[in-house]
From Swiss-Prot:
GO terms for biological process: proteolysis involved in protein catabolic process. One of its GO terms (molecular function) is ATP-dependent protein folding chaperone. The lineage of its organism: Bacteria, Pseudomonadati, Pseudomonadota, Gammaproteobacteria, Methylococcales. SUPFAM superfamilies: Glucocorticoid receptor-like (DNA-binding domain), P-loop containing nucleoside triphosphate hydrolases. This is ATP-dependent Clp protease ATP-binding subunit ClpX 3.
Length: 435
């Protein structure tokens, strides 16, 4: 009677540990691996991914002139702001690029000098392009980008969005990659609404003004923050997982209209007005323009407006934006790569219809936008109102070839002109002398 040969003892092909009740092995075609080696391999692969992400991010940073040239394709005017932003973004990502090269061992380390980051504060009237500038910068550099509305932020524990949610959304925008999120750009809109209210009662907790400024300080300056890993599609697994995000390298850009800020500037730089009488010096009646005042903004003006000194200090780069005039709105409608007129012309082209705006119509749209005081974002609502009826009717009318908008159409005195196929053919024959 022959007995079966003893079973061959299995060992982990990586560490050599023997298979046992407490040491199961995962078998492959030519080997086995234990749980401890699986976890170690996971860490190694994750480190490879981290190095790949950093290698992608530390690629060549566009030079300031290249950044501004790209901004020029999408944002009309605002030359000073675009120059300031181009330099600030270049310096920020140049610093990160060199730091990442040191981490990857691609460059020598200089521990004596640590270059700090310079967050940006954009100041200008509503609709002058603050959000567009920030989003375009993120697209140029190729980093994750989120917009946070300062008016919805509250201190943790109160109804509303707490500051940590900004980082959760940034992680989602980075497709769950913590490394990419830590190189992202956060734009905080309407930050002027966080100014301290002078009429706030002494015993009333300011949960959405100064309180939010205080809550933002540690994020903006740089700290280790734990957030829920909702966005971790690449690396994450189960719900409830938390990840730590280092905000030291996140570029924060804040923006706001700051209505009335120019009065603080004018009071600071203007001549004294206290002298009266026959021998008092004659004051120049010409007051500075708004854009001239915005270009002279100093931290003390922001403090008088209601921002706390600690918050102001975290935004050393100030980029003023000029009010837009009619000529600027005309250019915004027609010149950028994704100009509104071109967007609607493309929509109509899907239906085989040519959309035409006459020059007087373009000027009237610009003038109406100034009358409404809504800034560039008000242009779309005006065009939507003008084209609402044709956009409703044209898909059902296959013979329409052209849609013409003139000044009377903009003013509501006449409907848009629809040129149909038979009219177009008749006009062509008339021009050729056939009719």
């Amino acid at each position: 009677m022959s007995s079966d040969p003893p079973a061959k003892t299995q060992h982990c092909s990586f560490c050599g540990i023997e298979q046992g009740r407490d040491t199961p092995l995962i078998a492959g075609i030519e080997g086995q691996i234990c749980e401890a080696c699986v976890r170690l391999a996971e860490q190694v692969v994750a480190n490879w991914g981290r190095k790949r992400s950093m290698a992608e991010l530390h690629g060549n940073v566009p030079k300031p002139e290249d950044i501004k040239r790209h901004l020029d394709q999408y944002v009309i005017g605002q030359e000073l702001a675009k120059e300031i932003l181009s330099v600030a973004v270049y310096n920020h990502y140049k610093r990160l690029r060199h730091e990442s090269r040191e981490i990857l061992g691609l460059a020598g380390s200089d521990t004596e000098v640590q270059v700090g980051k310079s967050n940006i504060l954009m100041i200008g009237p509503t609709g002058t392009g603050k959000t567009l500038l920030a989003s375009t910068l993120a697209r140029i550099v190729g980093v994750p980008f989120v917009v946070a509305d300062a008016t919805t932020l509250t201190q943790a524990g109160y109804v509303g969005d707490d500051v940590e949610n900004i980082l959760v959304r940034l992680l989602e925008a980075a497709d769950g990659s913590v490394e990419r999120a830590e190189w992202g750009i956060v734009y905080i809109d309407e930050v002027d609404k966080l100014a301290k209210s002078p009429e706030m009662a002494i015993n009333t907790r300011d949960i959405s003004g100064e309180g939010v400024q205080q809550a933002l300080l540690r994020f903006v300056e740089g700290s280790q923050v734990k957030v829920a890993a909702r966005g971790r599609r690449r690396e994450g697994s189960g719900g409830g997982e938390e990840v730590t995000i280092d905000t030291r390298n996140i570029l924060f850009i804040a923006g706001g209209a700051f209505p009335g800020l120019e009065r603080h500037v004018e009071k600071r730089i203007g001549p004294p007005r206290g002298e009266i009488g026959f021998h008092a010096p004659v004051q120049d009646a010409k007051r500075p323009l708004l854009e001239e005042l915005l270009a002279e903004i100093q931290p003390e003006d922001l403090r008088r407006f209601g921002l706390i000194p600690e918050f102001i200090g975290r935004f050393p780069v100030i980029a003023p934006l000029e009010p837009l005039d009619e000529a600027a709105f005309v250019r915004i409608l027609t010149e950028p790569r994704d100009a509104l007129v071109r967007q609607y012309q493309k929509l109509f082209a899907y239906e085989g219809v040519e959309l035409v705006f006459t020059e007087p119509a373009i000027r009237r749209i610009a003038a109406r936008t100034i009358e409404r005081d809504t800034g560039a974002r008000g242009l779309r609502s005006i065009i939507e109102h003008i084209l609402r009826r044709p956009m409703f009717e044209i898909p059902s009318q296959s013979d329409v070839r052209q849609c013409v908008v003139d000044a009377d159409t903009v003013d509501g005195k006449a409907p848009v002109t629809l040129v149909r196929a038979e009219e177009e053919a008749g006009g062509a024959r008339l021009a050729a002398g056939e009719v």
